Amino acid sequence: MPAKSSGTTKPYLHFIGGNAASVTGSCTIVRFNNIKLAVDMGLIQTNNLVADYRANRDLMKKIKPKTIHGVIIGHLHADHCLGLLAAVAMGMQAYIYIPQGSIPILKIMMEDCIKIMAQDSLKMQNKHGIKAPPLATEGDIDKVMQWLVEVPFGVSTAIVGGAKLTYYHAGHIVHSAQAVLEIKQGYSIKRVGFTGDFNTEAKSVSVPPIEPLPRCNIVVGECTYSDPTRCYSMKKDRWYDEQVINAAIYQYNRILMPCFSLQRAEDILDVLWHTRATERKIDGQMIPVYLDSPLAYRIYKAWPDVLEYEDKLNLRLIESWEESQAVQQSNECAIIIASSGMLNAGRALAHLKYILPNSCNAVLFSGYASPNTIAYEIKHGAKEIMLDGELIQNNAQIYCLNTFSSHANYNQLMQYYQQIDYDRLCLVHSEFSNKVEFAHTLQDTLVKQGKSSRVVAAQQDQKVWL
């Protein structure tokens, strides 16, 4: 049974998750009519195994899963949805609303997450002498599955507490959604919008273009790229990115492309095919493209567009660790696509040990990297990288591809938040200093346009009354 409601209070938002201070661990609590909803339930993911474990455990204690009446999920990236496993493990019994079509991929994501949690628990015990039982186990997958409710896009749907939920396409990744929550309070109706992660420029045939949110009293909006240097022209810079990929394939021996398993890996395969760069032949054969990620492998097999790149590219899908090790230790000319994109986990780290020391190799980054990740260190010129306790020399060639990100860039954020209508905009999902500056700039722009909308940079644990 869902949690019982108790007490009465004026409706408010509580910025409880890590997305109030950074770009990971998304969760915002909505309180109304004695109901407690969570919008997103993500995991905190940085480059510190022990710190992440403790942060996720502490976040769950703050959320108090047993008191949650419902959860609204915007999309399936781990930092937005895989905290569901820890929540049900701690007793949450609540309906979980997700965009239509999401269930097959969510199940794959959860199965992979449970394996990683178990592995991380062993690492903390063996390497750090810390007893840290997994925050969730295999049985918790079924607990999540039994509470899932798929909600169609564009349909006002009644949910727990008498509220109504409408999903709008976000343009971020497959099945990604913005959410609008309509809450009846006395004789009035409050409308709260959540952009989640979004992109205003379509980049993949599997992702419908963004639908602007309707007028809302409050919008909780992401601003990942609130740094004004994060500007690019999709048409011009995609051409540049394709030229970089083409040149790298012909110039370097081994190319590592760290990426997220969901959406990014598939987008990279699509670009590799369309650039025709992989038609470079060695001994009469196209150079191999390795997709080395168990999660990406399973998502690839379940992808809605039934991508079949085995025939288009010399694509080799790697599932077992033994196969991965053979690829890592080989010196053949190859392109290796492996997770994770920020190099805070996954097989990309194992490949990195072999790729970095050799100046004949290259690393091509294709997305955002938080300041506390290995990807950030490398992108910012670090010549020595600590990998699994070993100091590795970085002699490889490093490139950053700007147009693969599934987030809106600085200019697109500015344009979108001027386009939609709201009384208040609460900014989340950004490095805090950038978010504050972005809020000031946007507020000044709105004032010059004669608009009365207010913009605030949400702070950790802040409550905002509706």
List each model region and its residues.
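A general structural motif
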Residues: 233-237, 313-325, 341-344, 379-384, ...
